[in-house]
């Protein structure tokens, strides 16, 4: 689940990812991953449309966590982290980033980065970096940007 901060919290990017798994012997949910301050987005009921984060289960059992800015400024983007359960931990298996510049139609790009293998495709070109296993608790978006060959 995605958890918004308390209403008086002024942090810009303080939406957390918390994943619970059902206990095998009881009807209880156990915390499997806690990653506070991982997702950027609007959290207020009267927040800005186009900045809402989301989380959903995928058919293969992975989770997709999406954040976006499709509302303000010329730089519009959507980012999806694909989380997979590996060796009793939730890791970032994939990173997808789509960017567009509203004032420069040729200034956009998209990138799909398989974090586990290090293979990426950006703008139709194949890229390769070293594969990594990164728990969601340790993930920083800069890792995805580097894998996509984007300099910060």
What are these regions (language model features)?
Residues 29-36, 93-97:
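Beta-propeller fold detector
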Residues 10-33, 83-85:
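Beta-propeller blade repeat segments, especially FG-GAP/WD-type strand-to-loop junctions
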Residues 12-15, 50-51, 75-80:
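Short, surface-exposed coil-to-beta transition loops
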Residues 55-152:
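Acidic, small-residue rich beta-repeat scaffolds with periodic aromatic anchors
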Residues 36-53, 77:
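Repeat-based blade/solenoid architectures
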Residues 5-9, 70-73:
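Short glycine/acidic-enriched loop and turn motifs that connect beta-strands
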Residues 2-5, 11, 44-49:
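A domain-level signal for the mature, folded cores of soluble proteins
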Residues 1-3, 9-10, 27, 59:
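Acidic, glycine-anchored loop motifs typical of Ca2+
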